[in-house]
């Protein structure tokens, strides 16, 4: 019996036509259910998840990165520009590491996701900070935000293009380099939470 040609094509789908998300491994058990590695030709779901609670866990992780890049200052609302930035950044990551850029991105997210943070509690008119564990969804949101903030800061008043800065930030976070913005901020968040116990 021959296989279904539609299903065969479906399983051959690669992000940007190059990178296979099915061979990516998520090592962090807390983030495993929230990092979506669904294969798709074009990482663009059109905001179908916007009104459903926890539905962003079903949005492919590459699209979530594109959406975060799109939300920064002069890139606001320009999805095609953000798409091209991430596409070129993935090419740079592959050139420098020789690995699947989606795997490098997943490692960077696992390393940049803070495990605990603080919340403000007001008791008897006095406010103080209390350490709390971060939910997996929030950990992923913070990691994406820190990585894109780091890339934006590297590119500001710098002749390097944003895609190169994004690639450098992702590679540095994947290697747990404490000089990069995302890892430095993550450690700062966890240090403040430890002091507030």
Curated annotation (Swiss-Prot):
One annotated GO biological process: translation
CDD domains: uS7_Eukaryote (cd14867)
GO cellular component entries: small ribosomal subunit
Gene3D superfamilies xref list: Ribosomal protein S7 domain
Annotated keywords: Ribonucleoprotein, Ribosomal protein, RNA-binding, rRNA-binding
Single GO molecular function: structural constituent of ribosome
HAMAP family per UniProt: Ribosomal_uS7_A
Role, per record: One of the primary rRNA binding proteins, it binds directly to 16S rRNA where it nucleates assembly of the head domain of the 30S subunit. Is located at the subunit interface close to the decoding center.
Matches recorded under NCBIfam families: PRK04027.1 (NF003106), uS7_euk_arch (TIGR01028)
Identification of the protein by name: Small ribosomal subunit protein uS7
Naturally occurring in which organism (per UniProt): Methanopyrus kandleri (strain AV19 / DSM 6324 / JCM 9639 / NBRC 100938)
Gene from which this protein is expressed: rps7
């Amino acid at each position: 019996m021959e296989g279904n040609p539609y299903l065969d094509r479906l399983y051959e789908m690669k992000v940007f036509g190059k990178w296979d998300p099915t061979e990516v491994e998520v090592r962090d058990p807390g983030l495993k259910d929230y990092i979506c590695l669904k294969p798709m030709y074009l990482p663009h779901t059109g905001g179908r998840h916007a009104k459903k609670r926890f539905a962003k866990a079903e949005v492919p992780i590459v699209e979530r990165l594109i959406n975060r890049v799109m939300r920064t200052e002069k890139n606001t609302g320009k999805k095609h520009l953000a798409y091209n930035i991430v596409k070129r950044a993935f090419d740079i990551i592959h050139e420098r590491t020789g690995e699947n850029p989606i795997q490098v991105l997943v490692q960077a997210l696992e390393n940049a996701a803070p495990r605990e943070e603080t919340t403000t509690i007001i008791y008897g008119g006095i406010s103080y900070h209390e350490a709390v564990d971060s939910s997996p969804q929030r950990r992923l949101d913070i990691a994406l935000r820190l990585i894109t903030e780091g890339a934006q800061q590297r590119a500001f008043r710098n002749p390097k293009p944003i895609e190169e800065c994004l690639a450098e930030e992702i590679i540095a976070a994947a290697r747990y380099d404490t000089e990069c913005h995302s890892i430095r901020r993550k450690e700062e968040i966890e240090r403040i939470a430890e002091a507030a116990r």
